[in-house]
Amino acid sequence: MQQETGIHPIVQCDPIAAIATPLGVGALAVVRISGATAFDIAGRVFRKARDPHQPLSETPGYTAHFGRLYDGLTLIDEVIALVFRSPSSFTAEDMVEFTCHGGPVVTRHVLQLLLDNGCRLAEPGEFTRRAFLNGKIDLLQAEAIGEMIHARSESAYRTAVIQMKGDLSATLGALREKLLRSCALLELELDFSEEDVEFQSREELRVEIASLQSEVARLVDSYQHGRLLTEGVATVIAGRPNAGKSTLLNTLLGEERAIVSHMPGTTRDYIEECFIHDKTMFRLTDTAGLRETGEEIEHEGVRRSRMKMAEADLLLYLLDLSREGMAEEIKEIVALKAAHASSKFLVVANKIDLVPDATTLLCRLGEEAGCEAIGISARQKLGIDELKSRMSSMVEGLDKLHEASVLVTSLRHYEALRNAGDALRNAQNLLDEQADTELIAFELRAALDYVGEITGKVVNEEILHAIFERFCIGK
């Protein structure tokens, strides 16, 4: 079910508590409370070192107080209490954050103390969800917080920070305002239909819709690069059996992740792992060797390998340079490169340490295959730094994309914008056909709702649940 959200008064909900820092041994940990009776609950268990009789409810916001937590007469810990008053807190509710000593036992004691005194254990992402529902952040910014927490590369982190700052929200807000204006003018016409009044000429509307289509199309197109920043560059290592694909995966990762054997066909299914080079994350996939086989399990592995190759942003074809008779394999390389024209393609010639005239063979290989070939020895770790640099250069500028413009990085946002673009296209076609105003207004309203879904102006409970369940309990 969807509903339109607007500016609502701050709602103080039931008090929730959670540990906001990772469980483990450390110097400090944070346990937070938020809700209508947060100050009352904190006041029952916390005594200030100075002026112990002054309740926290009487202290100003944005203040820190040293004191002790007690369970009755039993000392739990010495803590710092940070006070945040509604509406000037993260959730817009009254909040208290206790900074206690780190360690799982003491942290759990502090949390249990708050639960025993009236708090409910927060659900995953509930603090952020309350911030969204109380208008402190929009849905895009809430998602950006989650993306920043889960970021695995510098590029993903920087992109999340920019989204959290509100750049994409501002772009979509301006887009929504234009849509809202056109919708309002058309609906005014419907209200005054008996008077045959045009509040916006059809030519002006046509120009406006064309401009909106262009803006939406730019955002849709940006997803192709934006997803690489957050998801990483899908990099598939392909080639014949026993070319050294698993050894190369292990060498790039710096760990023994894949089983390595001299027996062909050891890898039966693909293996995925990530590594970061020059701030760019690569999602490496080691695939089963490409060959015709009657063995059922290996045949399925080859089928899955080809499926992953079709999804690759960067395809590394690994060739055993020490193997005799490369002519047939070169034909396969040429065919693969043509079949995966949308992917970056690099031939990696392995086992150069076993070939005396490796440089000559590499030149010949590059000429006959019609593409660049780079020589390595995965086992001896020769040429690996050069390979990593070449991989980064093939996606050059990716780490700076987040600085250049507003990017769409989420599949949810991408699909909503595609739907908005379809609705705008329908509206433009209806205009060309001189269709009824009501039909044009319907399509513009649909586009408006799709854009609203991204920022949370239009709320779908299933979407909210899917977004916030990914958060940790204390966020």
UniProtKB/Swiss-Prot annotation:
Cofactor requirement: K(+)
UniProt binding sites for (6S)-5-formyl-5,6,7,8-tetrahydrofolate: 32, 97, 136, 475
Top-level lineage group: Bacteria
Binding positions (Mg(2+)): 246, 267
Pfam families: MMR_HSR1, MnmE_helical, TrmE_N
TrmE-type G domain boundaries: 232-396
EC number: 3.6.-.-
Protein name: tRNA modification GTPase MnmE
Record organism: Chlorobium phaeobacteroides (strain DSM 266 / SMG 266 / 2430)
Gene (name only): mnmE
